Amino acid sequence: MSRNRTTDEAEDLAAGRATNGAAADWETSGDSNLADDDYAVALRGVVKRYPSGGGEPVVALDDVDFAARPGEFVAVVGPSGSGKSTLLNVLGLLDDPTSGRRLLGDTDVTSLSVAERTRARKESIGFVFQDFHLLPTLTAVENVAMPTAFDPGDASDRAANLLARFGLGDRLNHEPNELSGGQKQRVAIARSLINEPAVLLADEPTGNLDTDTGEAILAEFERVKAEGVAVIAVTHDPLVEEYADRVVDLTDGVLTGGLPGESDPHADADRRGGRDAGRTAPGPQMGGDRG
């Protein structure tokens, strides 16, 4: 990103408009055929620093460029404490960068108000947290419908359909204490999709699941991806990497392969091809009684 913008460019950015110079920056990074609005979500030159109690600030994200296309599954890997959760929080508009730009589709959200960011997050982003919470007094279908932006009737129908997709069609009226750990995680993932987000952010989505259920969840992510949703998952699970279209590495706040075209396409194809070759039957189905 250019460090010396004209006054007009600065005013355009403050108003949430991408300037020609900014678009040119994107087009010359990683993929010359892509402009801002070709991405579902993007970061440009993002820095995130945290105070360290009087010493030098901790740099969690160091001049990060990242983008995901609609219908792309990106896995983010790296050591613990390397900034992966911070990356998800900044992408998901849960935390603000110290500097840099953020875009959702063709909208520059860098200078939006708190209320505008909250609305954009609710309308465009779904979250699958590692430590999710279901309200104990609500049924599965009520938990899924809770964050909806739709009218209540449509929300209930959509919530029921999502739970059926996740193999929980016979658990609609069960409360969380009547569900296994894996079933509760599937309820949480279904809830993340209730508003038909353009972007799905997942923190260790298979971390608490057995291999079969994890594969079933990832197969559902592929179905979501086929519907045009960009899926971005922080993970330590090699299985998630096998399903991803692209794997990027974040170490000490430095992101490698963050833009389409920066990773090795042959390595990506080999990784996914090896997974597909190892299958002798269709992916596992999520049964209602599986944990």
Predicted region positions:
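Conserved ABC ATPase "signature" region
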Residues: 107-108, 154-170
